[in-house]
């Protein structure tokens, strides 16, 4: 079981969705703070705006989000931990780290800066 962040999910959705590693990740129990959805939608919108993908592909990926086997956790239960972690992390990144801490799960990310900071608190897997 793992906590997945938006950078890892975007990597899977846009660049690597057919790879064996991604299929393996998506077949495991995954958790994320509810902020995963707006962060992922924002990244997909930006990718379309920058013409990295077409609007149709980005829209299809957004629709696919609701089908993913990811348990979303409301963020209000993470508020205090987010506050405490936000000295060294953005509040957004702290959402993922605090959830991984609470659940005692590995954090999956594609953000090397986040991974470096998060390793002080949880195990981290970086997508390559």
Model regions and ranges:
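A general alpha-helix detector
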Residues: 39-43, 61-64, 81, 99
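Short active-site oxyanion
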Residues: 28-30, 70, 101-106
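Helix-loop-beta junctions that constitute the ligand-sensing/allosteric loops
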Residues: 90-92
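Acidic, PIN/NYN-like endoribonuclease modules and their adjacent C-terminal/linker elements
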Residues: 1, 97-128
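Phosphate- and divalent-cation-binding pockets in alpha/beta enzyme and binding domains
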Residues: 21, 39, 81, 116-117
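Short glycine/serine- and small hydrophobic-enriched flexible loop segments
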Residues: 42-49, 102
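Acidic catalytic patch
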Residues: 57-87
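Short, well-structured N-terminal submotif of metal-dependent ribonuclease cores
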Residues: 1-35, 50-59, 112
